[in-house]
Regions:
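Short, surface-exposed loop/turn motifs that are enriched in glycine and acidic residues
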Residues: 5, 24-29
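Glycine-biased, small-residue-rich flexible motifs in mid-sequence functional cores and linkers
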Residues: 7-12
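Bateman (tandem CBS) regulatory domains
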Residues: 13-26, 79-90
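The conserved cystathionine-beta-synthase
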Residues: 28-46, 71, 92-112, 116-120, ...
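Helical hairpin unit composed of two closely spaced alpha helices linked by a short loop
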Residues: 46-51, 55-90, 95-97, 101-104
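Short hydrophobic beta-strand motif reused across regulatory alpha/beta modules
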Residues: 53, 60-65, 112, 125-133
């Protein structure tokens, strides 16, 4: 007979909602924000990314990797509108999914963060970082 610890099974059933950041912990700036505002939001939340919101919906994202590439290009304008610099199709996962599924998506796409949605894909309710999943025991 095979016995499995309840803790091990519980960790495998961990949901994205169990480890996601939400509410005031969700990094987000408005579509018309300046690059300097996005940098401050990324720094404040320490997740390496900020969402870009237009009319209450996720319209894009900007990551610390994007910032490094902008800096390397020599065209760093802190007053540039973030909408001109953002990725318009950020990676997302549905809130009811298992954390292990989120981890698989992150590994497959070589990313550290997924936006979490509920209902429609632009209804963002949180963000999950790979470190949060791994600290959860996966």
């Amino acid at each position: 007979m095979l016995f499995r610890s309840a803790g091990s099974l519980g960790k495998k059933l961990l949901r994205v909602t169990d480890v996601m950041h939400q509410g005031g912990d969700l990094p987000m700036v408005q579509h018309d924000a300046k690059l300097r505002d996005a940098i401050m939001e990324i720094s404040r939340h320490r997740l390496g990314i900020t969402g870009i919101s237009q009319d209450g919906q996720l319209s894009g994202c900007l990551s610390d990797g994007d910032l490094r590439r902008i800096l390397e290009s020599g065209h760093m304008d802190l007053d540039a509108p973030v909408r001109e610099l953002m990725h318009s199709n950020p990676m997302k996962i549905e809130s009811g999914k298992l954390a292990s599924e989120a981890l698989h998506v992150m590994e497959e796409h070589k990313i550290m963060v997924l936006f979490v949605y509920e209902g429609t894909e632009n209804n963002i309710v949180g963000i999950v970082h790979m470190h949060d999943i791994l600290q959860g025991g996966l």
